[in-house]
Amino acid sequence: NFLGRDLNTLTEFSEKFRKETGLKFVLSGTNPASIEEEKMEVLIRGGLVRIKMGFESGSDDVLKLFKRPVRTKQLRRAAETLSKFRGKMVAPAFEMIVDNPFESNEDLYRTIEFLDDIPGPFTVSMFSLQFMPGTALTEEVDDFKTVEEHIDKEYMFSYKPTAINLFVSIFAIIKPSHFLVKLIRRMIAGREDNCYPLIKNILYKL
């Protein structure tokens, strides 16, 4: 986590990087809790043009399951800080995990509400949960078939074709209006298994 370094270290790096290379750079794998306005100002002066970070979910229950060091309160604060730098860098990318067998539809709706509520601009990258042998999360799964389905699959661009996954993916294209988010939820709530074509049609028209 590059941003975990203290402000003096980041200032020294930023000045040297700008003077010696003149290049632009992107930070990936950033811990949302390390996003601070002063640090962002320093790094943008040094050439930072984008940040990518794992938000994983907008549900505190799911973040706890993943043993993430942050909760939605910290994620929201990070998004609010980054939104202050719109126009100074490319919209940040927030990475979300889907196809989680421990996650309920309500958890997914919390993620959608979270994305709807935080300030833009931002983009969303979706990753299908992949169980890795020997990890703590895999050990919690009782059904081997569930694990088998998730092992060795392509975790990018292969999430399940469900209405809620498509709903989340809208945020990868645009930040829809509050009205549209509420309307779509009202249209599919309780009928998620049958609404994939409907959300797909909406997505194609955006």
Can you annotate each of these PLM segments?
Residues E103:
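Catalytic palm subdomain of template-directed nucleic-acid polymerases
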Residues N1-A93, V98-N100:
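Conserved SAM/AdoMet-binding glycine-rich loop
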